[in-house]
């Protein structure tokens, strides 16, 4: 099964299924000498893991990560880093009655048609459980980016269903507050509305989508490879690989269709750019401004409202999904999106350093 790796100079390969023995990752390209412990990775894993909030799935997994290679005496050696998380709270019997049917909105049908066989337990490889390893690998990237380059990456929820948080200037966001509440939301006034929405969804047996914003600050100018490996193209690819993501915007995104050129262009002055409509990327290369990415996630397909589907014989069936599921996947998607942005940025930084370390820039960076 191809498509399990991302990156070139910094490469992450994952494996494992939702109800298998565990999840694993191989992380290649981490420079030597980076102080690293499992606790560094656990901080982000604890932000993503299930069972930590009444507003998310109640499957309880400790998600304790083990570093099994690539680190010696607390520092990276420059060799492949092996990561392992063991599954401990599988309830495969919740899925025994759907092994011969296809859940609408899930990958059951497409996996079966592509491979002729599938692991029906919790979605197998298509489950969002796989993203735990992305978060672990992304934590390595985040630490390197922050410690060596001063790059910081933060995400927050801006929309859940029909409830929106107040749009806030990233420079004014209290990130400590964002990370202390279960919705990763920067707007205190939105929290009661988000809570009420989740409770209503549970009572009605349905779910809702969400929109998140992820921001990388301190990114140097010059990251990105024209033309097919543009930085924004690789970011979009990484974000679209996250389960349930159906839309990605860089900067103003779709709103640029309504703008005029004299407003949308990010003009340059000796003191910096006058705007950042492009989200910190021009011509596929980072401009030195904050990189701003928004993603839209569809509603969870596993809901208790009955729906129509077919079985493996092509016969119509009525579906009622059992198991432990998120009323809104956006609640736990923020650290996943942060991880994917970190993976892409570190990959492009290492590629840029390898090719252009000796380049003399004609002017001082203005961002």
Curated annotation (Swiss-Prot):
GO terms for cellular component: cytosol. The keyword Transcription does not apply. One of its GO terms (biological process) is amino acid biosynthetic process. NADP(+) binds at residue 48. Reduced FMN (FMNH(2)). It holds the Pfam family Chorismate_synt. Belongs to the chorismate synthase family. This reaction introduces a second double bond into the aromatic ring system. This is Chorismate synthase. It comes from Psychrobacter sp. (strain PRwf-1). The lineage of its organism: Bacteria, Pseudomonadati, Pseudomonadota, Gammaproteobacteria, Moraxellales.
